[in-house]
Each structure stands twice: as structure tokens, then as C-alpha cells.
């Protein structure tokens, strides 16, 4: 029916808005990069919870499980393939990894659903990393975790049925479509900056003289001269600058990237980049194919 298509279109538009909010506001506030006032950043950080993701767990996983250990096997949470993917040369290879470059995009689309229904609870109640086991979760954060999930699922699934009178099947289908889009978009924004065929996977934290060299070796930019991509990705296509200056708002990344690139060339430090996001995705899939077919 026409009304159903209108509902689905508006529902998908809402999902697109959630993606922009996550990449442009929530991520920056998580790094205290939006305002010099901590209360402002903390308040905006709850955008994660409004979108069904625990801001508390994201902060722990993203800061301790990524920024402090980029591309380190067994430490960087972004490299956790749960046996489905092989993201580093140091992970054991399984027969199905030969096809990971084929099924990757489909499973990446499940990323958002995984975070909403499983990942946050798994990290909170059944921690696997040492930094998660050492975390002393307060009762308040536990309450916010459940309240955020409940609020999100209520306005996304329950209210359209009860208030708008839409069929549960239609709402569930629209919900699935939204998360397939959000999951694929967010995953590709991040995966194309670290896990590509030209980045490096250190064996330990002390492999480089300082953290700056570590960042340059393990991180790559893409489409840095394309303002539209920068706007859509919340500046995360300028990923080297993001890791060098995580407390700087992404609206400053473009000019800073030009300075960083020039300085890297001046001191002979390799600067990795791709002119387009499409090429970055291609090189990510090349790495997956390489890791799936050889040790």
C-alpha cells in the first residue's frame, strides 16, 4: 500500500539520520571533541544510547580497545573477527576464510544489529579482554545500558505498531533494513582505515620508537579532498589526524590533514591514503582475500 511505502521511506530516512548522528556527533563527543565543557560532551555522548548502542561500553571498547592498541592482534577490538573473519596475519586460518572477501560486506551489514542485541551485553557481562575484566561497572551504568536499549526498541519497534497502527511485520522489516544500512556504512567507514593491504600489523606495543610512528604505519586516509565524504563519514576519512588528535573536532580535520601529510613527507614518514572510498574498500577486500588464502 502507498502508506506502507511512505512509512518505510521515512523509517529509512530516520536510519540515515542515526548514522549521521553516530558519526558526526556521538563519536566526537565520545572523544570530548565537541566542546571544552565536559558536561556538553557527556550529554551528547548519550546519542549512542538513543541509537541503541551503549555509550559507556563504546567508550571503553573504542578508547582502551582500539586507540591505545591499533592493529595489535589480541588487543585491538576492531580486529576481533570472532572466528568468522581473519583480520591479521597472526590469527589462525580456517577453511571458510578463503571466502571472507566474498561474504564480508553481507556480514558487515549485521554489525549494527550485533551491537544492539549482543555486543554490549557480551562486553558488559561476559568480558573477554583484560581491560574489560578490570572494569568496575557501576549499577548506574548497568541501569543506563538496559534503559537505553529499552527506550530505543520502544520507539523503533513498539510505538510504530501501537501508535501508528502499522503491522509488526512491516515495522520489523523496516527495522532490519535500517540496521543493514547503518551496519554496512559504519563498518566500512572504520575498516577501510586500518585493515587494508598496505597497513602494518605490529607484533607488540614496543615495536615503534613512539606512538606517532605506530599510527602512521597502521592507519590510512581516503578521499581527503572530497568534502562530501568527510561530511558523511564524520571526518573519519581523515583517520591519521583523528588518531594523532582525537580530542580535536572533526570539522578541523581537512586542513590538519594537509599539514600532517606535508610534515610526513618532510621527515620521510610513509603516509598512506586512497583518493576515493571505493578504492579504500577495494584494498580492504584485497587484504581479506590475501589473509584468507595464505599464512
Predicted regions and their residues:
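Alpha-helical bilayer-embedded segments of polytopic membrane proteins, i.e.
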Residues: 1-22, 49-53, 101-113, 137-189
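Extended hydrophobic/aromatic segments used for targeting, binding, or gating
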Residues: 161, 177-208, 288-291
Amino acid at each position: 500500500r502507498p502508506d506502507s511505502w511512505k512509512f518505510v521511506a521515512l523509517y529509512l530516512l530516520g536510519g540515515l539520520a542515526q548514522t549521521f548522528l553516530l558519526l558526526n556527533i556521538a563519536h566526537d563527543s565520545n572523544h570530548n571533541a565537541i566542546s571544552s565543557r565536559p558536561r556538553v560532551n557527556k550529554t551528547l555522548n548519550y546519542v549512542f544510547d538513543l541509537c541503541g548502542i551503549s555509550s559507556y561500553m563504546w567508550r571503553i571498547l573504542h578508547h582502551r580497545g582500539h586507540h591505545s592498541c591499533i592493529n595489535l592482534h589480541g588487543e585491538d577490538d576492531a580486529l576481533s573477527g570472532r572466528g568468522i573473519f581473519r583480520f591479521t596475519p597472526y590469527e589462525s586460518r580456517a577453511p571458510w576464510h578463503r571466502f571472507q572477501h566474498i561474504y564480508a560486506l553481507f556480514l558487515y551489514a549485521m554489525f549494527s544489529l550485533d551491537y544492539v542485541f549482543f555486543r554490549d551485553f557480551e562486553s558488559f557481562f561476559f568480558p573477554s579482554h583484560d581491560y574489560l575484566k578490570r572494569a568496575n561497572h557501576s549499577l548506574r551504568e548497568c541501569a543506563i545500558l538496559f534503559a537505553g536499549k529499552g527506550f530505543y526498541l520502544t520507539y523503533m519497534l513498539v510505538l510504530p505498531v501501537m501508535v501508528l497502527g502499522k503491522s509488526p511485520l512491516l515495522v520489523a522489516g523496516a527495522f532490519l533494513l535500517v540496521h543493514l544500512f547503518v551496519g554496512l556504512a559504519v563498518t566500512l567507514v572504520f575498516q577501510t582505515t586500518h585493515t587494508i593491504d598496505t597497513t602494518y600489523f605490529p607484533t607488540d606495543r614496543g615495536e615503534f620508537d613512539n606512538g606517532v610512528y605506530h599510527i602512521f604505519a597502521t592507519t590510512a586516509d581516503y578521499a581527503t579532498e572530497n568534502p562530501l565524504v568527510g561530511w558523511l563519514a564524520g571526518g573519519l576519512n581523515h583517520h591519521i589526524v583523528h588518531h594523532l588528535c582525537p580530542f580535536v573536532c572533526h570539522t578541523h580535520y581537512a586542513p590538519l590533514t594537509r599539514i600532517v601529510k606535508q610534515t610526513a613527507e618532510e621527515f620521510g614518514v610513509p603516509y598512506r591514503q586512497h583518493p576515493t572510498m571505493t578504492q579504500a574498500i577495494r584494498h580492504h577486500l584485497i587484504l581479506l582475500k590475501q589473509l584468507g588464502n595464505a599464512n
